[in-house]
């Protein structure tokens, strides 16, 4: 029986951990030592200025890089008529790192103390520095978008929101792009759920439920 105290005591014979950016820590609280580590990546967005929105009438994506589970900056026309540009994928300094000023020493230490993170940095240093440049420079962000829509100009970009991706990283420095489960008696820990989680949320939920119910027959 699992007892959870947050927000009041809850007891249950079966637990499914889908804690996202904190899933590895919840697994440790349950007595496991997960092989993967959650490393936060921030995805930053811009909106196109109204005078440039007419350049995009649908979805425009770059050819994906098979080395990464990220799609690259792309353009999406929303139901409101606005056009969203992004996201990039820059290492966040906190698991709540929606801005550069959001810094958690605990989260940063968790990333930097993990050997898999250093293997990732060594393997893809140039790509990582490019993402940082696009995060800090509107001109660099716009340059990436001009590969898709050459008529876009720097001044067409308006800063918008951001999100944090709970990216599971293996000890070999590889970014996971498929489900990663770990079990404990009476518990299933979901350490990685593939993107696009919102678009495929019902199917992902069905798969997690199927795996969670397997031991029950």
Language-model segments: which ranges?
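C-terminal catalytic lobe of FAD-dependent flavoproteins
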Residues: 100-106, 111-217
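Short hydrophobic/aromatic-rich motifs at helix boundaries and adjacent loops
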Residues: 1, 17, 113-117
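Flavin-dependent oxidoreductases
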Residues: 2-103
């Amino acid at each position: 029986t699992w007892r959870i105290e947050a927000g009041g005591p809850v007891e249950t014979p079966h637990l499914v951990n889908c804690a996202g950016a904190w899933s590895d820590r919840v697994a440790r609280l349950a007595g496991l030592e997960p092989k993967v580590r959650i490393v936060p990546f921030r995805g930053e967005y811009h909106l196109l200025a109204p005078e440039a929105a007419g350049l995009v009438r649908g979805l425009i994506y770059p050819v994906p890089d098979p080395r990464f589970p990220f799609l690259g900056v792309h353009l999406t026309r929303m139901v409101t008529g606005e056009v969203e540009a992004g996201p990039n994928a820059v290492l966040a300094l906190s698991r709540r790192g929606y801005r550069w000023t959001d810094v958690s020493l605990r989260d940063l230490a968790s990333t930097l103390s993990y050997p898999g993170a250093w293997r990732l940095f060594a393997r893809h240093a140039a790509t990582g520095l490019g993402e940082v440049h696009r995060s800090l420079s509107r001109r660099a962000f716009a340059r990436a978008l001009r590969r898709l829509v050459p008529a876009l100009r720097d001044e067409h970009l308006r800063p918008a929101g951001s999100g944090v991706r709970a990216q599971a990283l293996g000890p070999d420095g590889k970014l996971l792009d498929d489900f990663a489960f770990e079990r404990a008696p009476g518990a299933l820990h979901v350490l990685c759920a593939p993107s696009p989680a919102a678009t495929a949320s019902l199917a992902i939920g069905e798969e997690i439920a199927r795996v969670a119910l397997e031991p029950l027959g």
